[in-house]
């Protein structure tokens, strides 16, 4: 308990009578641990070529570092919750491990892709708060920090000194389901939890591969069009159109599978009415978007 909270509790003590229910008193004091409302992030975790790169090696990685520095200056971060495109499950799980492993969930890359470690501690106590807010979410310790988390976090918080845990994406549910579920995480923002949706507005592996592996990094055109459409909806705060992305003629081309798109929906579900939204980075590669933004 912070000193200021102790003093407030001390001041209340004379007013606690036998007739005052413990539950009511608990309700008063439950707000003492609240902190300044945390922002919410949506970010890409970069393309595979970014993984072995050091700090500030390109503009995208520099932007991640700048975001992390700014948030640490303005907020006291208790823990980070990452909703990663790389942890898809049947049902929704939350990792309550105290020491999450570094997961290399990619294949066929040079040795330097498999030697890096991001040894941030977990936050079991905070992770269990998720199951209290959303009882259908189940606990597990059989996961760690995957490609959607540590390659981004090692630039945003390079000291790995902020506790991190992940929540999975139920692959078999609709975009609207995820939007409604994510709303229930809002109380965590008042408890010092930085929530990050890590995915990509545009992520078509098949089409990206056709150009990436030939050294052609020029976008197709349709990828830019969809990415800009998303930006326009963000600026208009037309969140429902973003949730209903499959109705856009390019929606299922830009996101043929939901895994990388759904983290965007989680981040947007946490936005309050009239809350600010700042575009933090914008870059297009073939069939792949590095767009990111900060809410709050």
Spell out what each predicted region is.
Residues 39-44, 79-84, 167, 188-201, ...:
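Beta-strand elements within well-structured catalytic alpha/beta cores of enzymes
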Residues 59-70, 176-191:
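Long, well-ordered alpha-helical scaffolding segments within enzyme catalytic domains
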Residues 124-179:
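Internal, conserved structured core segments that host functional sites
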């Amino acid at each position: 308990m912070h000193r200021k909270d102790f003093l407030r509790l001390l001041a209340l003590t004379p007013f606690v009578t036998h007739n005052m229910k413990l539950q009511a008193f608990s309700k008063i004091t439950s707000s003492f641990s609240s902190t300044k409302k945390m922002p919410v992030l949506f970010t890409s975790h970069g393309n595979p070529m970014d993984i072995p790169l050091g700090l500030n090696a390109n503009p995208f990685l520099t932007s991640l570092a700048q975001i992390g520095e700014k948030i640490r200056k303005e907020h006291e971060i208790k823990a980070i919750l990452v909703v990663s495109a790389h942890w898809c499950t049947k049902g929704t799980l939350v990792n309550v491990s105290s020491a999450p492993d570094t997961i290399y969930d990619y294949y066929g890359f040079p040795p330097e892709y498999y030697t890096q470690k991001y040894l941030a501690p977990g936050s079991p106590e905070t992770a269990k708060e998720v199951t209290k807010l959303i009882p259908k979410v189940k606990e597990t310790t059989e996961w760690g920090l995957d490609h959607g988390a540590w390659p981004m976090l090692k630039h945003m918080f390079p000291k790995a000194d902020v506790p991190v845990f992940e929540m999975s994406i139920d692959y078999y549910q609709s975009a609207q389901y995820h939007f409604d579920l994510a709303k229930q995480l809002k109380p965590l923002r008042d408890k010092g939890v930085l929530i990050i949706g890590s995915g990509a507005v545009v992520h078509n592996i098949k089409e990206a591969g056709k150009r990436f592996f030939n050294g052609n990094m020029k976008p197709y055109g349709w990828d830019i069009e969809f990415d800009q459409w998303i930006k326009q909806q963000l600026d208009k705060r037309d969140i429902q159109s973003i949730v209903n992305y499959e109705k856009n003629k390019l929606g299922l081309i830009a996101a043929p599978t939901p895994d990388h798109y759904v983290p965007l929906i989680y981040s947007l579900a946490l936005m309050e009415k009239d809350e600010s939204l700042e575009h933090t980075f914008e870059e297009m590669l073939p069939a792949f978007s590095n767009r990111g933004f900060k809410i709050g």
